């Protein structure tokens, strides 16, 4: 049987820390082509990962993380996901996430109308914060959070 005796490993990494580093039976993420589920002996993949959730299952245990955008790679039974932010669903504070969204939207409204390089970059960064906040709320409501 394919994969017999083999194990899939997953690493979920942010610039600050390694969020998850261990065995997995199934890793699910949203990449450029849509949602992907990876099990042992999966074919190699390199892609971007979108603001969504990453679900890591091992046995009866499932861990869910709200993530920002980043990169996704599968090779040799190792899934590597590199993102700016990854928060366990159980640790998400919905009120705090909603506050982050409101604050970022206020900042967007205060940006100058002209589109010079600095304001374009600021608009992109603030828009990313809004998307992350919205994703935190979505994941907390779907998978449990505070």
Swiss-Prot record:
Pfam families per the UniProt record, alphabetical: ATP-synt_DE_N (PF02823)
Keyword vocabulary terms for this entry: ATP synthesis, Cell membrane, CF(1), Hydrogen ion transport, Ion transport, Membrane, Transport
Subcellular location: Cell membrane
An annotated GO cellular component: plasma membrane
Chain residue ranges for the region called Disordered: 103-124
GO molecular function terms attached to this record: ATP binding; proton-transporting ATP synthase activity, rotational mechanism
SUPFAM superfamilies associated with the record: Epsilon subunit of F1F0-ATP synthase N-terminal domain
InterPro entries per record: ATP_synth_F1_dsu/esu, ATP_synth_F1_dsu/esu_N, ATPsynth_dsu/esu_N
Membrane topology per record: Peripheral membrane protein
UniProt keyword Transport present: yes
HAMAP family: ATP_synth_epsil_bac
Oligomer and partners: F-type ATPases have 2 components, CF(1) - the catalytic core - and CF(0) - the membrane proton channel. CF(1) has five subunits: alpha(3), beta(3), gamma(1), delta(1), epsilon(1). CF(0) has three main subunits: a, b and c.
Family listed: Belongs to the ATPase epsilon chain family.
Functional summary from the UniProt entry: Produces ATP from ADP in the presence of a proton gradient across the membrane.
This protein's name: ATP synthase epsilon chain
Gene name for this UniProt entry: atpC
